[in-house]
Amino acid sequence: MLSISNLKELSFLVYGLGITGQSVVKFFKKNKIKNFTVWDDNKKLFQSNRAKNLNEVLNKVDFIILSPGISDIKKKNLNKFNSKIITDIDLFFLTNKNFKSVVVTGTNGKSTTCKLISHLLKKNKFKVLLGGNIGTPILDLKITKDVYVVIEASSFQLSHSKYIQPDYAILLNITNDHLDWHGNLMNYMNSKLKIFKSQKKNQFALINGKLEKIFKKRNFFSKLVVPKEKIYKKIKYKIKNHYLKSNINNENMSFTYTFSKLLKISKKSFISSMSSFVGLPHRYEIFLKKKNVIFINDSKATSFESAKYALSNSKNVYWILGGKPKKNDKIFLSGIKKNIIKCYVVGKNIKFFQSQIQNKISYSIAKNQKKALIKILNEIKLSDVKENTILLSPAAASYDQFINFEKRGDEFKKLSKFYARKFI
């Protein structure tokens, strides 16, 4: 651990002034750490403390705190300074003590699992804070003694982290994602596995069973715990929560249940706590039911692996698909195409998605959500199917038409409510 007085003897470059970078600057100013400079390609973002000669600063500083949004450090000529690069989460672990940390990562389910664990802790009278990639930047949190800090860590953050040492490190899953950022699956996997690298023998590693062999080969020191879905399923029926009844949350819940047992939270308390949990928006969000139609917003599904969960857990689906596809993503429909009545392709990459689904399922080109919904609702009016599902689960990023998945999901909900009144 480093004290604030130790930090004052070191020099820093804050590279990238997005939300994370601005949080680091705020942390330095609050603690009267003056020996720092900043750099961002957008010269309008920050004028004071700005590096005048970037190469000179890179060579002189002790640490470079890199924004998680900066992908290719080679293009930025930063790779030769890799030993100096750290992240805001490193700074958090280096400067805080007397707290318990739960760091969650994985391709799918990070945010939901963080919220589940945070909710569980609050309901069982633990002091808890939630931050990192979800909500509050980690350095903005006010740490008090014995507080549990639940941190969502993305692969971008972990890729350059060196000092993360969680009491409970959770790796939910790894599938093809962010390969445009990491280059290949092995780099992506290695960034996720860094969550365990600095753990001690008295700390816990909760890991997906499919990754157990890889974990053991790396000779990590922490106590390995592999959650079992079949154990969670024995109590699942007792949880009175419609959102958690779906199989889509089985993995998130099995990790949360395993974590609860490590803290010796009783089964009864776990069941009671989970019954009051409210799910996050844009994650298999059932937001409207009208007559024989269920509307589900799963805008957070930015890869097919994510969308597959929603398709597997829905019936008679009118599926809205499309956006900016992830690198090397493939659509495999075996085992789930029976759930799909028809697919509606939207966005600016129609040819890509068309090539993935043609000759597999019935589909229509709709270009945007509005046109898709009008087509779907007209077809439902002519259908004799008793219960229909309109599912936005795009299997792609939103950036072709929206600034983020939240805006995409909000637009879908707004349009759905409007056209449901007109057609149903």
PLM ranges: what are they?
Residues 36-41, 205-209, 320-322, 339-348:
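Short internal beta-strands
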Residues 329-387:
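C-terminal helical cap/extension that packs against the catalytic core
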